[in-house]
Amino acid sequence: MAPSRRAFLAAAAATMAAACSNQATRSDASASTTPTRPVPSTTPTTAGRVGAHATNVNGKPAKVVFAGPRTRRQVALTFHLSGDPALASRLLDTAAQAGVPISLFAVGRWLAEHPALVQRILADGHELDNHTWSHPMLGRLSGPAVAAEIRRCKAALTQATGSGGRYFRPSGMTRPTPLVLAEAGAAGYPLVVAYDVDPRDYTDPGADAVAARVTARLRPGSIVSLHTSHTGTITALAPVLTTARVRGLQPVRLHRLLDGRPSGP
C-alpha cells in the first residue's frame, strides 16, 4: 500500500475514534447531571388545604402529647363525642352553666347524624377535633384502613364546621402506634393528643367514682379523657369543676393549653 494511502487511513481512524470518545463523554456527563423527577413515597394528598387548622402539609409523622405545660395552672377537659345526643346536650348545658370551655373529639359518623348539636357546640365556643369516622379498634386495621378512618372524619368535620380540626385522637388505644402517627401526620395532623388522666368512665363506675378518679390525678397541664355517652360522666362534671376551681386550675380549650411546650406522661 502506498505511504500516502496508509497515512490517509490512519488519520481517518484516529478521527472516528476521537468522535466516539467525545460522544460517550457527553452521554456520561448528561446522565450524571440531568435532574430526574423524584418518585413520591406516598400518594400525594391535599392535607393542609382542607380545614383551617390542618397545618402539617409535609406529611411527617405526627407527635403524641399526653399533657400540657406543668408550669401553668390550666387543664383541658376532653370528651370522646359519640352516642346518645341527649347526653351530649346535658354535657353542653353543664358546661354552659359553669362557663367553661371543653374540647370534643368527635366520631365523624356522629357529626353527620347530629348537625344541630354540632352547631351548638361551635356557638358555645367549644373545640371540635378528629376521633375517627366510625370508632374502630385502630390497632387491628391496615394502613389504608387507618388512613380512611382519619380522612373521612376530617372530611365530616370540614363539611360541618369549615375546619378539619387541629388534633387527632385514635380510637381503641391509649398510646398511638407508629402506623397511626404516620397516617395522622400524612392526613394533616401534626399532633396526636393522648391524656394523663383517665378515669375509665366508659366502664360505668358511677359519677362518684369518675369524679374521684379525675380529681385524684388532676394537676396543672392535665388532659382529662372523658366520654359523652355515659350518664355518670355527665353527672361527675360539676364536682370535677368545683374541685378544679378550689385548686386554682382553669379549664381551657386544648389549643390554648398546648400553645406552650407539651410534656410527656
Where are these regions (language model features)?
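Active-site beta->alpha N-cap acidic-glycine motif
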Residues: 48-141, 145-149, 156
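C-terminal domain-boundary segment and adjacent tail
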Residues: 35-37, 42-44, 48-49, 57-71, ...
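Short charge-dense sequence patches
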Residues: 39-44, 64-69, 96-109, 160-168, ...
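Short, low-complexity, disordered segments immediately C-terminal to signal peptides
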Residues: 21-42
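Catalytic domains of cell-wall/extracellular-matrix polysaccharide-remodeling enzymes
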Residues: 90, 136-265
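Secondary-structure junction/capping motif
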Residues: 4, 25, 253-254
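N-terminal secretory signal peptides and thylakoid transit peptides that target proteins
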Residues: 1-15, 19
